[in-house]
């Protein structure tokens, strides 16, 4: 059954011809989209010179367009977003309440103040809008400017915000952008693009946006498109397989900016057990880090290291904290977290095995597939910790922080930490092991766009940093004067 159609948005045109079917990631439904092999030659710019119209725009005009776009992205009145939402109910594992909320939070992203903060903090408005002068020690004059590039985005499909951020970053940098829509969020980027065309028809920003779907690995499309004379950068949010797949096309002139899959962790200090009120507050914060978007994100808490100690009192505290976290987790509002629609059956089998092995683990909840907390009764995570999902987390009591740092590596993205004093103690150490973001417990999934991501600054990386040098022979010693007489 064809559940919905994913059009091709081609620089202001909406194309629904030459449709072919594709499978969704969940269920038996299919969707249809134009056969991209018929349109791949039309996706890239004919010439890089065609980007010059973007540089005729003042940043105030860019802000005007984005603000109008944000105002138009009102879920209750925007038919494009409503269509994207209906498709997401078929394509995505998240429940309706969460998917709808992911659309309702879009308008503030495009506000003037927010866009200005992102652009200035992550690139610098002076570099985006003109040539910034510097004088070097040898006397040469440099003028540096951040130019946009021809970018292909392969965004993740875990919520509408990713598609919105992708478009926002591209517009800020004055880039020409092609977006490969994810199969589990197929229409959000299309909906935003169509809304942009409604509020700014024939505008340069609209004419430098392409959104479409093709199956990853389609050689008829990718071998034609993924070339330096078509695109200069690929921003890939995908899973390990898709990121590895993209690397086959990387060559001089074509750069990969990988926002690759990560795991996150939590560290809770002894102060959490000072009194019942503190423990309850810590439990509420930890439950939020676990439960947001049903633990589908890279930033969600999964393994929670607790500096409770492993003696009898320490284990009792860890078990009590586990009970409180479970209670708070199952009480989160539906726009934040619900029992998962498609729990991992293999993980559920592991849970039941742990439940029967109560000398080593205490399992709290999980009988109704609503989520669970597994409290290790030793200082090791469960051996299935990479599988933790669907609101299942593992509390690991430890005696010292050394046990925690040993578990941090290059795959560690976010670490939520309580209390703040412990975070300050660890902030110069954890990055050495691979941690990329340290945040207050409870804010792991409350991510700021105006900040680095995955230990890089992706918006700066999307830019080409161009240097104009001026060397006066009377100031900068010319090489020809170094020749022997």
Feature map (PLM): residue ranges:
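Conserved small-residue-rich beta-alpha loop and adjacent elements
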Residues: 115-199
């Amino acid at each position: 059954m064809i559940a919905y159609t994913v059009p091709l948005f081609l620089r202001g045109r909406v194309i629904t011809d030459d449709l072919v079917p594709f499978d969704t990631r969940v269920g038996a439904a299919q969707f249809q989209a134009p056969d991209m092999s018929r349109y791949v030659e039309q996706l890239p710019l004919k010439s890089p010179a065609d980007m010059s119209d973007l540089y005729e725009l003042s940043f105030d005009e860019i802000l005007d367009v984005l603000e109008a776009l944000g105002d138009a992205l009102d879920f209750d009145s925007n038919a494009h977003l409503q269509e994207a939402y209906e498709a997401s109910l078929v394509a995505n594992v998240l429940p309706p309440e969460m998917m709808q909320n992911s659309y309702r939070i879009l308008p503030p992203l495009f506000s003037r103040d927010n866009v200005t903060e992102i652009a200035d903090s992550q690139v610098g408005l002076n570099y985006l809008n003109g040539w910034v002068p510097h004088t070097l020690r040898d006397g040469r004059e440099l003028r540096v400017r951040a130019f946009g590039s021809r970018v292909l985005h392969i965004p993740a499909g875990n919520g509408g915000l990713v598609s919105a951020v992708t478009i926002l970053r591209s517009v800020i940098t004055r880039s020409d952008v092609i977006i490969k829509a994810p199969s589990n969020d197929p229409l959000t980027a299309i909906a935003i693009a169509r809304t942009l065309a409604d509020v700014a028809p024939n505008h340069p920003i609209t004419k430098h946006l392409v959104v479409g779907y093709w199956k990853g690995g389609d050689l008829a499309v990718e071998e034609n498109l993924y070339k330096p004379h078509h695109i200069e950068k690929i921003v890939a949010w995908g899973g390990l397989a898709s990121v590895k797949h993209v690397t086959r096309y990387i060559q001089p002139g074509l750069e990969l900016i990988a926002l690759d899959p990560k795991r996150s962790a939590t560290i809770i200090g002894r102060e959490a057990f000072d009194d019942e009120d503190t423990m309850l507050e810590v439990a509420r914060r930890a439950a939020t880090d676990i439960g947001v978007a049903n633990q589908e994100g890279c930033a969600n808490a999964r393994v929670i290291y607790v500096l409770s100690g492993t003696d009898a009192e320490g284990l009792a505290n860890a078990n009590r904290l586990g009970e409180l976290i479970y209670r708070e987790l199952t009480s989160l509002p539906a726009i934040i977290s619900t029992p998962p629609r498609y729990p991992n059956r293999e993980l559920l089998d592991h849970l039941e095995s742990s439940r029967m092995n109560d000398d080593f683990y205490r399992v709290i909840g999980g009988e109704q597939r609503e989520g669970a907390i597994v409290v290790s009764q030793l200082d090791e995570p469960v051996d299935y910790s990479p599988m933790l999902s669907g609101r299942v987390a593992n509390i690991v009591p430890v005696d010292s922080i050394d046990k925690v740092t040993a578990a941090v590596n290059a795959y560690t993205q976010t670490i939520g930490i309580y209390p703040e004093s412990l975070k300050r103690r660890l902030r110069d150490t954890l990055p050495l092991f691979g941690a990329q973001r340290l945040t207050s417990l409870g804010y792991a999934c409350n991510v700021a766009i105006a900040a680095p991501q995955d230990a890089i600054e992706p918006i700066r990386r999307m830019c080409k940093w161009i240097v104009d040098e001026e060397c006066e022979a009377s100031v900068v010693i010319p090489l020809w004067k170094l020749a022997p007489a």
